[in-house]
Amino acid sequence: NRYLSWNWSQGREERPCGREPARRAVESGYAAQRGSGQYRGCTAYVDYRELLEKEDVDAVMIATPDHTHAVIAMAALKRRKHVYCEKPLTYSVHEARQVAEAALQAGVVTQMGNHGQAEEGARVVQEIIADGAIGAVREVHVWSGARFWTWPTWDGRPPETPPVPEGLDWDLWLGPAPHRPFHPAYHPWTWRNWIDFGTGLLGDLGAHKLSTVFKALKLGHPVSVEASATK
């Protein structure tokens, strides 16, 4: 299994992924915070269900592809674990309602993570608008020039069926999504471009860029949405 790391000065870089590289990343992060510079003790699992069965954890952080957020969150909430889930909270409105109800029943602490909203720039923008420093805001334009959204796309499902990379449990990765053969068009990273797995540019980067606008201007829920495309 591989994952893609993005270096804005050098472009895309492909690195090994999977259970063991993830474990080493966690251990090196903790080691950097210790005077000894060493840390061992992170147990890595392939299946989140096995983790929840075996480990007496207090909280769960979910940072998986969009289409699996809800099923993992529900499994954790049923065991009354605190949950921190990255945006978007779920893949659909129906899932969001289910997760919200489960959280109420569990009586635990939950939060949707959005680092775009948590950064200092978002706070500064909100303070500027609240202070009236730029007057009344009547119109907002938000766009993205993120290069990873211009990576190769497909008009339909690719016909090739290459072998599943070593270390990748493809059935587990698919989770609740309709089954399809593995292809690098879906994973890693570009699952965001497919409706069965991701929520598109709006759900991916829009959650970061639009959240500050909605919060600063106290807009509430959208009343209408219009979309257009060139193809």
Please place each PLM-identified region on the residue numbering.
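N-terminal glycine-/serine-/threonine-rich beta1-alpha1-beta2 phosphate-ribose binding loop
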Residues: 1-81, 85, 94-109
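Short loop/turn motifs at secondary-structure junctions
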Residues: 38-40, 56, 133-136, 221
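Short, solvent-exposed loop/turn elements at domain surfaces
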Residues: 54, 149-151, 181-183
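Residues embedded in well-ordered beta-strands within globular domains across many folds
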Residues: 61, 138-141, 174, 226
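A contiguous active-site-proximal alpha/beta segment in oxidoreductase catalytic domains
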Residues: 67, 82-86, 90-172
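Alpha-helical packing segments of well-folded alpha/beta enzyme cores
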Residues: 72, 95, 121, 209-212
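Rossmann-like dinucleotide-binding domain that binds NAD(P)(H)
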Residues: 163, 167, 171-231
